[in-house]
Amino acid sequence: MKQLYLLLITLLVSLSAYAEKSGTCGDNLQWKLTDEGVLTITGTGEMQDWHKSKPSPWHADKSVKQVIIGDGVTTIGSSAFSDCDSLTSVTIPNSVTTIGSSAFELCFSLTSVTIPNSVTTIGYYAFELCFSLTSLTIPNSVTTIGSGAFFSCFSLTSVTIPNSVTTIGSSAFAGCSSLTSVTIGNSVTTIGHGAFYGCSSLTSVTIGNSVTEIGYYAFSGCSSLTSVTIPNSVTTIGYYAFSGCIYNHRTTKTNQKYPSVNL
């Protein structure tokens, strides 16, 4: 009888452990995690949002190496894959329109991500502290890059902001110390406060001709940046926007507010 009791207990524990490897993550979404570390999200509609006090059901399992999000999923929930420090690969389908805040925060092993043409919003701190992220493609569908979206992605070397983007949030690329060049598309109107703060390897920046505001500390601490051309559209440059970096700046001849300076 005792042996039978122990056998039943062992079986229940095993079933419980198995049950924790699958479940729901939205009204019409399901998730499943294999022993090989492949996490699959299937179904239709929005993914649930999570936060630090209520993390995702797979958060405690540090074996997640690959995430496959099925076609039909429309949002990636806040903090959905936060702290999945073994994650190296993620597949995002064309049905996704929003990448939630802190969605991939602290994914230390993630090296590249392709954001599909359906995504319009990259939430704040979405890829914060993804230390290994070297490759990034932002499609023409994105209109908003949230505050701190790529904060301290130390390995990121270059980025092109497409013409669809209108706002680059505060600290969006701050601390990206390997970033050497930035091209800002012609639809961007605002470069947020500290957007590229501390990008110490940044040597080249092209500012599109629709930018009206460069926030305070926007390029502060970009010690390798020696020159920048400010278009005629700019009417506001925040304090310390270029502190600790450029020795000269150029503006278009018709810009009456900010004359060219060569120190």
Where are these regions (language model features)?
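Boundary of Sec targeting at the N-terminus
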Residues: Y18-E20
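Surface-exposed ligand/attachment interfaces on beta-rich extracellular proteins
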Residues: S22-Q30
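STAS-typified acidic loop motif
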Residues: L29, D35-D49
